[in-house]
Amino acid sequence: FTGKLVGTIKTVLGTAAIGKMISDSVNAGGALQQSLGGIETLFKDIADKVKTYAAQAYKTAGLSANDYMESTTSFAASLLSSVSQDTDAAAQLANMAMVDMSDNANKMGASMQDIQNAYQGFAKQNYTMLDNLKLGYGGTQAEMQRLLKDAEKISGVKYDLGNLADMYSAIHVIQTELDITGTTAREATTTLTGSFASMKAAAQNVLGQMALGEDLQPS
């Protein structure tokens, strides 16, 4: 009797696990489909480039493709406007920003959500969350201006307040100077926490691809 009971429990648990996997896959697929539509609408002819960045985000930013695209679409319109609708330039800048956000979260110990909120705020010329980045600048317009000036001293490039591409580029310069750039990619291959985040994001990609009927190929 005990053996039968154990077998029944195993069967039930196995069925529940399969059911959860199917449910998770459907949910991930629906979210992924919506994100893909947003990327195609915003980036048009260069959308495939953004999708490639998204597919690699589990390694470069510790994010699933869907999380990467959702965050990118939240500031893409403002970014496109700041580069005169140059979709290729915007795609590259968006990828730089996404990796910078993840690098900051991993190096400085800040919440990824707090950092994403800050970047989305910059797209609306709201600088109150600049201090979320923990780069030594307060959450004011004057402090963002100071960051731009500091970045200019390092790179020799002039950055304009109010231009989103300039702000993201200046933050990248400061983070590179502070040896923050590249943290996520390094941790994905050298630390348990980084490896786990990368594997978790990759697993979410697989669930989404399964639901959309895509080929599951190694990246």
Please describe what each predicted stretch is.
Residues 63, 110:
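Short glycine/serine/threonine/alanine-rich loop segments
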Residues 84-87:
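Short, solvent-exposed hinge/capping segments at secondary-structure junctions
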Residues 7-61, 72-82, 93-105, 114-160, ...:
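Small-residue helix-packing and pore-constriction motifs in hydrophobic alpha-helices
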Residues 2-6:
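Alpha-helical membrane-interface segments at transmembrane helix boundaries
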Residues 181, 185-188, 192, 199:
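Alpha-helical heptad-repeat coiled-coil segments that mediate oligomerization/polymerization in large
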